[in-house]
Each structure stands twice: as structure tokens, then as C-alpha cells.
């Protein structure tokens, strides 16, 4: 018999059929009506050699547009940052090269310590005492925070700013829809949350208030004023989604009274690869420690007094509590968390502040040059490394023309909100040079729409 794939032997097949008490594989599908079954063979290409396959896949991959060949000003949640070479060196080591949770601490001390260091650095950045081992990405981390606020306060309404990333808001909707949690969106004014509307919406039925800092439009929310709005609503939780790189320079949300801070560490050591995989983080106050989703690594000592690391407070988790678990998240992004840990460690505390500062300086240079070229800014508030401009005509058409010039331009905000037709979100990171920024401004000015 000629096989089109690497098969089991006929003897293997017969032994399995005998073990389950049937005579043929046909019997396995006897409950599927005959008229809906697939007949014949699938229309697959003939097999080729490994060399031929590698060549074909390489040719397919070469059609992709990537930031090694194109200059990118695209952000909106996925950013083009420099990744120190030490990151790949460390995460490629065989003892680390896994995303699986280290349930056996006696053979996983290295990985557990690395996760512990990740938690520690996130805690320092956010200004909160407890951080978990990681989440899938920034969106799921934020959605888990919303669920936690509802469970902790025993309330079923959450206020979410429209300045929060639209994809994050979509994930929140997916998480909460089946749990009868009412999501109320708060409008924006000049690129930040409408505080007057927020103030009117807060009452004794609100579980949490969700804002992003810096927000989706790159603007810095007035966190002190938001904190003041919540002073008379002690049970209502303040949930903040933050770019951790920005927190290397900005005041940590924990100092503004945030109960939960979440975000995405893609900015540290994780490449922009079709939007994933990423690594979410989740930090909170001590009072919520036993309700934190995901894994927690703790430091302890063994009976001989030797320092060690273990998964702790596991009674929260679904492999023990089942349906009473604080969350149904059942894994983490350990490998990507390690990449972020290595990146943050190699940058260092002072280096992180300098890196954040360079992002801010280059973004301000780009904004200045665009203004000089006659481009109109959408908002005039403070920002980190992203800002919104107005362009004449369709952003998608302009982006297509710029792509022909070797430039990946900003995000078309009309994709998520038709009222923002002609608005482009620009991201400028440390890897953009003065020449690249000047070229972008020139090419944008030369486009006729």
C-alpha cells in the first residue's frame, strides 16, 4: 500500500481496533450520516522533498512585508522595538525553551526564579505589590481584571473608556457577555476619557472603572483627576491598562490608587509577528492576592534553609478548585515572560528610563516636523510615543501609497470608528532614525489624495 503520509503499520491499526472492540475504522464514524461524510481523497499536492518544501515556504514568506526592510510607524498595540541579542540566547537554552507551567519545583528552580524576577519587575513598574507569572496578552489580562472586579465587589456593571484599545474592549465583551456583566462605555473628549460623563456614571452599582494609560490614542489620561472621582466610591475598583515601557518614565498607576494594572510586555524582547504571541501582565494590591488569575511564583526556604521558588496560592486555580476557581485561564506565556525578563534585565532600571525618554523625544521630533509640514494634529494633550494626525482623504489609500515608498505608516482609526475617517495613529520608537522620520514627513507631504 502507498501512503501519502507517515503512517502506522497495519498491525498497529488492527491492535487498536481490537482494543476498542470494533472491526474497522468505518465503525468509528457510524454515527455520522452517510450523506454528510467526505468521500474520496482530499485534493492535496503530491509530496515533495524537504529541500523543495523549504524553498517553497521561503518564497511564500518573502511576500511578507516586515520591519527589517520597511520603515514602520505602525503601533496600536504592537511595536517595533530593538530586541537585545541576549534575549534569544537565553530563551533558546533547552532548560527554558518551553511555555509549560513548572509544576515540579524540584526540577524547575531556574525557570521559577526567572518567573519570580518577571513578577518583581512588573510589581516595581506598576507600583503594586503583587504580580502574576503572565497572561496570554494585554487584552485577556484586562478582561480578567474586569471579571475580578465584578466577582470581588459582587456588582455587575463596569465602566470602560472608549479610549481603551478597541480590540481589548472586544475581548472584555467576549469574557463578560455570558456572565451578565453590563459594560458601559464612556466617551472621549480631546483624545481622553470624558471625566464629566464618567463622574455622572459612577454610582454604588459600579464594580470597576477601566482606563488605559497611555491610552489607545497615545494620550495620557488625567489619572489624578480619575483617582479623585473615585474617592467617594471606595468599593469601585480602578483598573488601568498600561504600556510597561511608558511606566519606565511615567508615574506608576499604583500611585494613583489603581487596584489592578494590566498590560502587554511585547515592548520588551518580543518581536512584532503578525500580532502574536504576546505576554500579558497582571498586577494588583495585596487585598486581591487570593483572587489573582493565573500562576503566582513565591520565594521560600526548604527545611535546610536554602532559598527556593514554588508555585504558591494554588488553591485559587482551576486544577484544584475546578468550577470555583478565580479564573479559567489554564496556562501562561512563560517563554515570552522570560524574554521580557531578560530584555528588562539587560536594559536595567536607569536604561529603561532612558529608553522611555528616547521614545518620547523621537515622537516629539516627528510631531514637530509634521506640524512644520502643515499636518494637523487631532489632539493637543500630553502623550508618550504615539499621537494622532488628521490627513486629507482615506488613511488606507495614503498607507498604500506610502507602502510603495517602503514605509509602513500609521494605524487607520476609521477601521474601528467610522467617525474617525482621516485620522492616523502614528507610533515612533527608539529604532526610528532622524532620516527615517524626515523621509516619512516628506513622503506624506508629497502624496496627493
Curated annotation (Swiss-Prot):
InterPro entries from the entry? GcvPA, GDC-P_N, GDC_P, PyrdxlP-dep_Trfase, PyrdxlP-dep_Trfase_major, PyrdxlP-dep_Trfase_small
Q: Out of the domains of life, which is the source? A: Bacteria
Q: Which UniProt keywords apply?
A: Oxidoreductase
Its catalytic activity?
A: N(6)-[(R)-lipoyl]-L-lysyl-[glycine-cleavage complex H protein] + glycine + H(+) = N(6)-[(R)-S(8)-aminomethyldihydrolipoyl]-L-lysyl-[glycine-cleavage complex H protein] + CO2
Any one GO MF annotation of this record: glycine dehydrogenase (decarboxylating) activity
Q: Report the EC code(s) recorded for this entry.
A: 1.4.4.2
Q: Name one GO biological process term.
A: nucleoside metabolic process
What does the UniProt record say this protein does?
Answer: The glycine cleavage system catalyzes the degradation of glycine. The P protein binds the alpha-amino group of glycine through its pyridoxal phosphate cofactor; CO(2) is released and the remaining methylamine moiety is then transferred to the lipoamide cofactor of the H protein.
- Family, per the entry? Belongs to the GcvP family. N-terminal subunit subfamily.
Query: Self-association or partners: how does it assemble?
Result: The glycine cleavage system is composed of four proteins: P, T, L and H. In this organism, the P 'protein' is a heterodimer of two subunits.
What is this protein called in UniProt?
Probable glycine dehydrogenase (decarboxylating) subunit 1
Q: From which source organism is this entry?
A: Oceanobacillus iheyensis (strain DSM 14371 / CIP 107618 / JCM 11309 / KCTC 3954 / HTE831)
Amino acid at each position: 500500500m502507498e501512503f501519502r503520509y507517515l503512517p502506522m503499520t497495519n498491525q498497529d491499526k488492527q491492535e487498536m481496533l481490537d482494543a476498542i472492540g470494533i472491526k474497522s475504522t468505518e465503525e468509528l464514524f457510524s454515527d455520522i450520516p452517510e450523506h454528510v461524510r467526505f468521500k474520496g481523497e482530499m485534493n492535496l499536492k503530491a509530496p515533495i522533498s524537504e529541500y523543495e518544501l523549504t524553498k517553497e515556504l521561503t518564497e511564500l514568506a518573502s511576500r511578507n512585508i516586515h520591519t527589517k526592510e520597511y520603515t514602520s510607524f505602525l503601533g496600536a498595540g504592537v511595536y517595533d522595538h530593538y530586541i537585545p541579542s541576549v534575549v534569544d540566547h537565553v530563551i533558546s537554552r533547552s532548560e527554558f525553551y518551553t511555555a509549560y507551567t513548572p509544576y515540579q519545583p524540584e526540577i524547575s528552580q531556574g525557570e521559577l526564579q526567572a518567573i519570580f524576577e518577571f513578577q518583581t519587575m512588573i510589581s516595581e513598574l506598576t507600583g503594586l505589590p503583587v504580580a502574576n507569572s503572565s497572561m496570554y496578552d494585554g487584552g485577556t489580562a484586562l478582561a480578567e481584571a474586569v471579571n475580578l472586579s465584578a466577582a470581588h465587589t459582587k456588582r455587575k456593571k463596569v465602566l470602560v473608556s472608549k479610549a481603551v484599545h478597541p480590540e481589548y474592549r472586544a475581548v472584555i465583551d467576549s469574557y463578560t457577555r455570558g456572565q451578565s456583566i453590563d459594560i458601559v462605555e464612556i466617551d472621549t473628549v480631546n483624545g481622553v476619557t470624558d471625566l464629566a460623563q464618567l463622574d455622572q456614571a459612577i454610582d454604588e452599582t459600579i464594580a470597576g472603572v477601566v482606563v488605559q494609560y497611555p491610552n489607545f490614542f497615545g494620550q495620557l489620561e488625567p489619572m489624578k483627576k480619575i483617582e479623585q472621582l473615585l474617592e467617594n466610591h471606595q468599593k469601585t475598583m480602578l483598573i488601568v491598562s498600561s504600556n510597561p515601557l511608558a511606566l519606565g518614565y511615567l508615574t506608576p498607576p499604583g500611585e494613583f490608587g489603581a487596584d489592578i494594572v494590566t498590560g502587554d510586555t511585547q515592548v520588551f524582547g518580543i518581536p512584532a509577528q503578525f500580532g502574536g504571541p504576546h505576554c500579558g501582565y497582571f498586577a494588583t494590591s495585596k487585598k486581591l492576592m487570593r483572587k489573582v488569575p493565573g500562576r503566582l511564583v513565591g520565594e521560600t526556604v526548604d527545611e535546610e534553609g536554602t532559598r527556593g521558588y514554588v508555585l504558591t496560592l494554588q488553591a485559587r486555580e482551576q486544577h484544584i478548585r475546578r468550577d470555583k476557581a478565580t479564573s479559567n485561564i489554564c496556562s501562561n506565556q512563560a517563554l515570552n515572560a522570560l524574554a521580557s525578563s531578560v530584555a528588562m534585565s539587560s536594559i536595567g532600571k536607569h536604561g529603561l528610563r532612558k529608553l522611555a525618554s528616547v521614545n518620547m523625544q523621537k515622537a516629539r521630533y516627528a510631531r514637530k516636523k509634521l506640524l512644520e509640514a502643515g499636518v494637523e494634529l487631532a489632539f493637543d494633550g500630553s502623550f508618550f510615543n504615539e499621537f494622532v494626525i488628521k490627513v486629507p482623504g482615506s488613511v488606507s489609500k495614503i498607507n498604500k501609497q506610502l507602502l510603495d515608498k517602503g514605509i509602513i505608516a500609521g494605524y487607520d482609526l476609521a477601521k474601528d470608528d467610522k467617525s474617525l475617517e482621516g485620522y492616523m495613529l502614528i507610533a515612533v520608537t527608539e529604532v526610528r532614525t532622524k532620516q527615517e522620520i524626515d523621509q516619512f514627513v516628506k513622503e506624506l507631504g508629497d502624496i496627493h489624495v
